[in-house]
């Protein structure tokens, strides 16, 4: 599903917890989130990792430009660039 925003935080949590990866743009910066074995990494495209080995809750609480992921992932402030396994 390309470019489709998440309707609820629960949908987003389920999506990540089942092993899917995400590309998104927030405030003009492209980020990636990848999960493996209940551990998550966050990176900036073409710049490298900014967080490694996070739990799901730590991922949701990770701040992007001062705002927690959980507070903007379902809003129109974020553009979902890709979703894939």
Task: Go through each PLM region and give its residues.
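Compositionally biased, low-structure terminal segments
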Residues: 7, 13-15, 41, 46, ...
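Mixed-charge, Lys/Arg-enriched low-complexity segments
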Residues: 1-4, 52-85
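Amphipathic, interaction-prone secondary-structure segments
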Residues: 16-47
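Negatively charged, low-complexity tracts enriched in Asp/Glu with abundant Ser/Thr
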Residues: 1-23
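Short, surface-exposed, charged/polar-biased interaction segments
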Residues: 8, 33, 37, 77-81
